[in-house]
Amino acid sequence: MDREAFEFEASVIIPVRNRIRTIRDAVNSALSQQTTFPFNVIVIDNHSTDGTTEALQEFSADNRLIHIIPQENDLGIGGCWNVGVHHEKCGKFAVQLDSDDLYKDEHTLQKIVDTFYQQNCAMVIGTYLMTDFQMNEIAPGVIDHKEWTVEDGPNNALRINGLGAPRAFYTPILRKIKFPNTSYGEDYAIGLSISREYTIGR
């Protein structure tokens, strides 16, 4: 990895639109991470109308939270990601958290960033558990995409519908490739693009 200077080692990126029921928990999960490095949380609020914007303003006292309302009105999830990644405060690693998700524990962000250095990769993909709103496990349970292998990951990726989560990216590479401005399959598309030239860590 190059020595490009970043103020923050990592940024948790949360695109959101109308998720008043879950956005507070998602942001709290991100802000509660315990790390050995500085990080922030960038929320791209895609013109919410259900109180999500006001809920995010409740975190205004925490300067680690950057709340962005894009000027554009035609952004999909991928477009929101591009806004966040190109923000001047985006960290060296851009780490996904969906607006209706939680990290497993307060050490998740540290584990993800450590993996970048251990495996010298451009993207890291983890494992997640499907639950209901009460955090009870629901089918299909754990999603780990074990069909991915170091030797044949890119080829296997063409045979599955998604690459897994949480996803994290080395920001300089992501800024060059960019997400497609869509709200379905944008993560799969960027993963396939990265896998053509770079290593994806698991």
Residue ranges and their predicted role:
Residues H107-A139:
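Conserved donor NDP-sugar-binding/catalytic core segment of glycosyltransferases
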Residues G91-L102:
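Short beta-strand-to-loop acidic/aromatic patch adjacent to the donor-nucleotide binding site
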Residues V150-R202:
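Conserved nucleotide-sugar donor-binding catalytic segment
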Residues D45-E54, N73:
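A conserved acidic beta->alpha catalytic loop
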Residues E9-S11, N40, A189:
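Cell-envelope/extracellular polymer assembly enzymes that use nucleotide-activated donors
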Residues Q71-K89:
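Glycine-rich, basic loop-to-helix element that forms the pyrophosphate-binding segment
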Residues N28-P38:
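Short, acidic, metal-binding catalytic loop of nucleotide-sugar glycosyltransferases
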Residues A30, N46-H47, L75, S99-D100:
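Conserved short acidic donor-positioning loop in nucleotide-sugar-dependent glycosyltransferases
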